[in-house]
Amino acid sequence: MTEKLQPLRGMKDLLPDDYKVHDYIINKARDVGVLYGYKQMSIPILEYTKVFNRSMGESSDVISKEIYSFLDKSNESVALRPEFTAGIIRSFISNGLQHKLPLKFFSTGPVFRYDRPQAGRQRQFHQLNYEYIGAKGAITDAETLKLAVDILKALEIEQDTILELNSLGCSESRSVYQQKLVEYLNDFKDQLSEESKIRLTKNPMRILDSKSEIDQKIIAAAPILSEYYTDESKEYFEELIKYLDILGVKYVINPRLVRGLDYYCHTAFEFTTKKLGSQSTILAGGRYDGLAKIMGNNDDVPAIGFAAGIERIALMREYNISEVKPVFVLPIGENNICYALEIVDKLRLQNISTIIDPVGKIAKRIQRVLNENAKFIIFIGDEEQANNSLKLKDLEKKEEYIVDFAKVLELLKKY
């Protein structure tokens, strides 16, 4: 018996009902982005692995454990994108867009991470991504957060999320804090998880993201970053809070929320929910003024962005999405097919969704139409063809009309 082929573990087909929801989410998010001046762009799914090594760091979980990376036929190390930001900044640099700042980009599509599949977490999943490049200051961060709120409102899930907010401060703040954090953690280094022992020497702030229960108990009493803010960092965060209050954005300050990469600074945020269990983050982002230079640009470029998981948004609520119901055209006999094709073509030229079903017994074809929850059937038999007319059946009203094409158009366009 021939093997029944299956998709790879953690990679799901998007069937029409799934895609309908995805498309709805993307369109709603895109429309809100347009109101804020964002323009859509697309980047390759495949990049050189070094694009992500530079941006995310080789000690990160994504690079060390989750990235789909391999040698291509030219012996180049390439990777399926695990996120959008690195590719967007690579595109910004390689296309020489430095003289067109500021830029607002919206992107969407699949990303890939070799992770343990579970509800809300697959190995191929889809994201909405927004990047605001070339604009600095707390007002930019506030506007970006308001954009995120408005997207979640448009998707009718904002009321089920909490905005968790923190400031990572400037590089000076983080440098002093990291030193204090290492001093504290060194007293517990024998008790840390194996991963955190490695991070202690490579990137200690990543330990604050650890999911290990042992690490969490140690972290609970660790120094807090806000205790080491410079005056500049304090002023920046206070200004952001002022703007958010003016905009009516509700938030909770989470002093443990960090980003473990050097190019992140100041604002970091996550929108979380209690509706999805352990996969609680719906949308997350932050300011990353240092990334462009790390990736080869001559200078630092201020930037802020965020990404949201489409599959997780889809799990948050059930969307009742209205669909265009096509008109079905059923030629009764083979000799009616040519006339039926002409009618179908005319209807489509009038932007009326039309499906012709010419094969099989008429009773079975009618049943197929009923299974599609259609509203109208057009029957074409010898009599209709001879009289240049059509038999239109309204399945909801259970009424039939024998009319010419112009009258059919008039009736169909009412619905």
From Swiss-Prot:
The gene is hisS. Belongs to the class-II aminoacyl-tRNA synthetase family. Its EC number is 6.1.1.21. It catalyses: tRNA(His) + L-histidine + ATP = L-histidyl-tRNA(His) + AMP + diphosphate + H(+). One of its GO terms (cellular component) is cytoplasm. It is found in: Cytoplasm. Keywords: Aminoacyl-tRNA synthetase, ATP-binding, Cytoplasm, Ligase, Nucleotide-binding, Protein biosynthesis. Homodimer. This is Histidine--tRNA ligase. CDD domains: HisRS-like_core (cd00773), HisRS_anticodon (cd00859). GO terms for biological process: histidyl-tRNA aminoacylation.
